Every structure is written in C-alpha cells, then in structure tokens.
Amino acid sequence: MGIHGLTKLLGDNAPGCIKETKFENLFGRKVAVDASMHIYQFMVVVGRQGDQLLTNEAGEITSHLQGMFFRTAKMLEAGIKPVYVFDGKPPQLKQDQLAQRTERRADANEALEKAKEAGDQEAIEKYSKRSVRVTREHNDECKRLLRLMGVPVVEAPTEAEAQCAEMAKSGLVYGLATEDMDALTFGAPRVIRHLMAPSSQNVPVQEFDREVALRELELTDDQFIDLCILMGCDYCGTIRGIGAVRALQMIKKHGSIEGMLKELDPAKYPVPEPFPHKESHEFFKNPEVTPSAEIPPLKWTAPDEEGLVQFLVNEKQFNEQRVRNAVGRIKANKTKANQGRLESFFTSLPKPATADKAKPKEDDKKRKAGAAAGGKDAKGGAAAKKGKFGVGGGKK
C-alpha cells in the first residue's frame, strides 16, 4: 500500500528531494528491487485482455514471467545491476491489513462475476485487476528465472522494502526500485520510481532523496516516521479527518503523534481502536532485516541461455527467438556493464578539518597579508591544482 499521499506531499512541500532522470543514467548502479510488488504489477498489467491473463497452452499464468524477464533484460542491457528482494513472513502488525485485502479481493471476485453476467467489459477489467493474487508458486518461478538470468536474489525475513532500505543504507546498493513510498519511511536514502515502467508509458524515472526531503520538510527522522503513520500505512489505522496536509501541520505543531494525541479533540478526530502507532514507529525504525554484512556477496553472472530456453520456451511456451535475442543483448552488454561507473575507481577523501574556523580574525588577516605579498611570484597556484579531469584532479 505504501504511504497515502506521500508523493504529492513531497512534491508540494519538498520539491528539491525529487529528481527526474533517464533510465540509462543508472548505468553501473546496483539497485535493490522490491520483487513482490513488481510481480503483482506484472500480474495486473502484462498481457491482460479483459479478465484474461497471459497464459501458456496448459492454462498456466505467465504474465509475471513475461514482465520479469523482459524488464530485467532491459536493465541488464543498460548496464544496471538489479538485485531482487522477496518478502518473507508478514509482520504481526500487518495482519489486519492483510485481512482487509483478502476481504476486498473476495468482494472484487463477487463484483467480477456480476460484471460478466452483465457483459460490462470495463467493469470486468476493473474487478479482475482487483482480484489478482500472487502465490508462492509465482514467486518461486520468478526466483528460478532470475537465477537463470544470472541475477542475485535476496529473501527478506519480513518486508522486502525494509530489507532493501537496509541494503541501501549500508551502501550495498545505490538505491531501491519500488512504487511504494514507505521505503523512505524505512530509512532508504534513495528511492527510485518508474524504473520498471514499460517504455510505452513514456514515464520519466524519479529519484527521491530522503535527506533532502527531511531538510525541506523541516522534520527529524522520528517526526517523518510519525508523519507517514498519520498519513496511512500498512501497520496502523488512520484518524478520520486527518489527511496528508493536516498530518504535516500537526506533526510540526506537536512534534509527535504522542504529543498530538494529548491535545486532540476525540469528537472531531476519533482515534481508531486499536491505534498501534508506537509499535508501527518502532517497526519502521528497527524492522527485522538481515544485516548487509551477512548477505552473501552479490554476483551478476552470464545468463544460462539453454536453461532459459528450457524453462521459458519448452515449459512456458515463450517465443524462442525473442528469448535468445534478449539473452544475446544481455551478453553483448555484460562486458560494458562490468567496467562500472567512473567514480567507482576513485576513493573519497575525508573532509578537511574545520577547526581553523574558530581561530581569531587576526590570524586570517595575517594569512591574507602573506598571500598578497608572495602570490605574484609563487609558482603552482591554482593552475598547478588542475588535474586530469579539471580543477581538483578528480571527477565525480
């Protein structure tokens, strides 16, 4: 579900945290991908005709494999290094949300049958999308596919987005690709949206910078988490009458949900029962994840062409020529991708000490006077500092 209205709130109140970029600008980047969310999207969109999903001759659904194979191939061709992270066991806090989803899916199935009886094609497509359910088999098939493609797979203890955020915070990956904005709430420094969008949609890739978002919103980390909980998340109900704008106002005024509740008029803003905002805050701040140091080394290997043909063509009835062509493009671009980005060959230097800033102004005057006296005859100067890539001798 993500965080209700967070994208718009950031666009209106922290526009500097959003940057549009091009797909190819992520060349050489390691990107953690929320696998479960994207598999669901593939099931909803890829190859759909009315209420019919893409299937093979045996009637087995293949929409998830079609989407996963060709979108992943596109990233690999562009030199992007994806690592797919799959959901583990849902946290206890999410049980109510999952129960609601099951109920909504049942309602959608009932509405779908009525739409079929009425011959309402628009309603048929609408409710069939709402009734989609990703099974363990779909996930396992995608894991098999990715391993055949030479792409690493990570299985999260609980939420994939929390695991992705851990990997991004530690520097194991550049950022995480998802459409759910609660990745920022989990602490991901950089969230990438629309990376998996089909080219036909012509949607620009967006990067969200968490540090800039907090700075422009003028919120601390804890306040940002409380803001997201108030706006609506998977782990806690919402307070009727408090939307995104009012949530931001209240967090800025009271500093926290706890402080807000002490002064809230329950007649005007009824608080649901239960309202596990403290537990939700703790889960966002300290989710159950595998520490990056304990994740096996991420390796991107050459695709197993014959293994992919066996799986996709012989078992799932994919077009063999399309599969082989995609594998050929991946192999052709693998050497280029392995060269990496230019900045990966440079080591960042520590920032210079700032203790001199506290020295008396008299010392500054003496230094300036000395520079003025000897500057004209000194050799080197600014020109001597110019390196191979320009001023400073390095290129970021």
From Swiss-Prot:
Its EC number is 3.1.-.-. GO terms for molecular function: 5'-3' exonuclease activity; 5'-flap endonuclease activity; DNA binding; magnesium ion binding. Residues 1-105 are annotated as: N-domain. Residues 354-366 have a biased composition (Basic and acidic residues). GO terms for cellular component: mitochondrion; nucleolus; nucleoplasm. Mg(2+) 2 binds at D180, D182, D234. It is an enzyme of class 3 (hydrolase). Its cofactor is Mg(2+). The keyword Magnesium applies. Residues 370-384 have a biased composition (Low complexity). Keywords: DNA damage, DNA repair, DNA replication, Endonuclease, Exonuclease, Hydrolase, Magnesium, Metal-binding, Mitochondrion, Nuclease, Nucleus, Phosphoprotein. CDD domains: H3TH_FEN1-Euk (cd09907), PIN_FEN1 (cd09867). It is found in: Nucleus, Nucleolus; Nucleus, Nucleoplasm; Mitochondrion. GO terms for biological process: base-excision repair; DNA replication, removal of RNA primer. Mg(2+) 1 binds at D34, D87, E159, E161. Residues 123-254 are annotated as: I-domain. InterPro entries: 5-3_exonuclease_C_sf, Flap_endonuc, HhH2, PIN-like_dom_sf, XPG-I_dom, XPG/Rad2, XPG_CS, XPG_DNA_repair_N. Its main location: nucleus. Residues 338-346 are annotated as: Interaction with PCNA. Binds 2 magnesium ions per subunit. They probably participate in the reaction catalyzed by the enzyme. May bind an additional third magnesium ion after substrate binding. Phosphorylated. Phosphorylation upon DNA damage induces relocalization to the nuclear plasma. Interacts with PCNA. Three molecules of FEN1 bind to one PCNA trimer with each molecule binding to one PCNA monomer. PCNA stimulates the nuclease activity without altering cleavage specificity. Structure-specific nuclease with 5'-flap endonuclease and 5'-3' exonuclease activities involved in DNA replication and repair. During DNA replication, cleaves the 5'-overhanging flap structure that is generated by displacement synthesis when DNA polymerase encounters the 5'-end of a downstream Okazaki fragment. It enters the flap from the 5'-end and then tracks to cleave the flap base, leaving a nick for ligation. Also involved in the long patch base excision repair (LP-BER) pathway, by cleaving within the apurinic/apyrimidinic (AP) site-terminated flap. Belongs to the XPG/RAD2 endonuclease family. FEN1 subfamily. This is Flap endonuclease 1. It comes from Chlamydomonas reinhardtii. The gene is FEN1.
